[in-house]
Amino acid sequence: IAEGLEAVTYGQAEEADICGKLIDCAPYLRFQWRKRGGEWHEVSTQLIGSYNIDNALCAVAVGTYFGVAEQEISAALSEYAPTNNRSQLTKTEHNTLVVDAYNANPTSMRAAIDNFALMDVPHKMLILGDMKELGEATEAAHQEVVDLLDARDFAEVWLVGPAFAATRHTQRTFADAEEVKAALEAERPEGCTILIKGSNSMKLASL
């Protein structure tokens, strides 16, 4: 279908039409980008997670293709603030929340956990919900997440849903978001940075 059409490449490889370089993610993503042979532009975003650099570079590629000025592209990326439970950082009276509860699959779950592990923050807590629509891969995918958690040094991990409950795990488990709410009311965390991630149907955004 794409034969004969113009292709625009983007990524962190030097040969890409739109090349990006990660600066840091502490906790917000900061990166540089340039068109092939052009000048570098630095962008400080309001997105959590170094994995979001590819999404940002895709937006850059679309903008440059349609002739948007490079400074305007960088400004738009800096000003964008997620409001859809995707890579949101929210500070409450008691804790700091990293909310990524719109969707979850094995790749995005691993990326979120790895990025959270790299964040230099105190008392890291995770509330992770089942990943839906995985079919026959459900059992293995959730066990892989649990094994990844076992290899990390997190202060506390809560697993939500029947798929996580069916794994070999040592973490605390909950049937659904309502059980988590009850636990949070009874033993409210204080001074924690909490990653909340799971499929949308797990309703973790309601916590």
Predicted feature descriptions by range:
Residues 9:
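Predominantly soluble domains enriched in secretory-pathway, periplasmic, or organellar proteins
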Residues 12, 33-37:
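Short acidic, glycine-rich loop/turn motifs
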